[in-house]
Amino acid sequence: MKGTIIKGIGGFYYIKIDNSEEIIECKARGKFRHTELTPMIGDYVEISIDKNNKGAIEKIYERRSELFRPAVANVTQALVVFSFKNPDINIDLLNKFLLLCEYNNLKAIVCFNKMDLVNKEDYKDIISMIEQAGYDIIFLNAKEERNMDIIKKLIKDNVTVFCGPSGVGKSTMLNKIIGKETMITGNISEKLKRGKHTTRHSELIYVDEGLLVDTPGFSSLDINFMEKEDLLHCIPEFRDFIGECKFTGCLHHREPNCAVKKAVEEGHIHKNRYDFYIKTLEEFMNRRKKKW
C-alpha cells in the first residue's frame, strides 16, 4: 500500500492511504537508519502490514522539496502572508520569505491580509514590485472571509504551508480554512489515547482535497546556509537576463556591461528588489571574508 505521512510522533508515523480515508500507524524499518534517511511529514511512502496488523514503512519515495522548520517534505506551495498595517510591512522581510521559497523550490503566492485597514492605492509601488517579480497576489480580510474562497481553491491538489511574520493573521486564516469540518486527522489523538501532554509536532491536515501544514513555515529566517551562487538563482526576475552579461559568472554587482543592471535602469526589474539582492549579496561576501 502507498500513502502520505500526515503525522509523526514518538517513533510512530501515521499514513493516509491513497484514495481512502484510512490512516495506518506504522514504524520505520531499521534500514532507514543506515541510510540516514528519516521519515518526514509529507513523505510519500510504501508500507506493509504484518499478520498482527502492524504497519511498517518499507520505502520512502524521492522528495520534491524538503523544509526543516517545520520539518515537512513535498510541500508544493507557500502562501506568504503579510499585512500593510498592523503590523506595518517590512519589505526586506517579505523579500527574504520569497527568497526562501525560491531556494526550497516552492511556488510562492503573496497574500496581503487586513485589507480593511488600508487603501490599496497607497501601496501600489510595493504591489507593482511583487507583480513585476512574477508572483501572484491575493488581497484578503480573513476575519470577514474576504477572498478566502480563492485560498481554498488554491489548496486543492497541493501541499500548502503558510508563512509570514507574527501578527499578520496566519492563524486566523488557518482556522477559517480548517473550520469545524470533520477532518480525517482529527481523531488520531483520541483514537490512539496518547494523552494531551504529548510534545506538539506539525501535521498535515486533509482539507478541500489538499493537504495543509497545520503550523506556519519558516520559523527561522536564517539564510546564512546559502551561498552567493544560490542567491543569484533565487531572484526569478534575473533569469531572463542571465547569459546576456559580458562576463560569465557575473554577480550583477560591480561588473561592467551587466544585463541585469541594465534591466534595472530600464525598469524591467524593480529597483527595490535589486537593492535587496545587493544588500544580501554583500552580507554573504562579508561573512566569507570573516571566515578567513
Swiss-Prot record:
SUPFAM superfamilies: Nucleic acid-binding proteins (SSF50249), P-loop containing nucleoside triphosphate hydrolases (SSF52540). Residues 64-221 form the CP-type G domain. Zn(2+) binds at residues 245, 250, 252, 258. It is found in: Cytoplasm. One of its GO terms (biological process) is ribosomal small subunit biogenesis. It is an enzyme of class 3 (hydrolase). The keyword Iron does not apply. Its cofactor is Zn(2+). GTP binds at residues 113-116, 164-172. GO terms for molecular function: GTP binding; GTPase activity; metal ion binding; rRNA binding. CDD domains: S1_YloQ_GTPase (cd04466), YjeQ_EngC (cd01854). One of its GO terms (cellular component) is cytoplasm. Binds 1 zinc ion per subunit. PROSITE patterns: ENGC_GTPASE, G_CP. InterPro entries: G_CP_dom (IPR030378), NA-bd_OB-fold (IPR012340), P-loop_NTPase (IPR027417), Ribosome_biogen_GTPase_RsgA (IPR004881), RsgA_GTPase_dom (IPR010914), RsgA_N (IPR031944). Monomer. Associates with 30S ribosomal subunit, binds 16S rRNA. One of several proteins that assist in the late maturation steps of the functional core of the 30S ribosomal subunit. Helps release RbfA from mature subunits. May play a role in the assembly of ribosomal proteins into the subunit. Circularly permuted GTPase that catalyzes slow GTP hydrolysis, GTPase activity is stimulated by the 30S ribosomal subunit. Belongs to the TRAFAC class YlqF/YawG GTPase family. RsgA subfamily. This is Small ribosomal subunit biogenesis GTPase RsgA. It comes from Clostridium botulinum (strain Kyoto / Type A2).
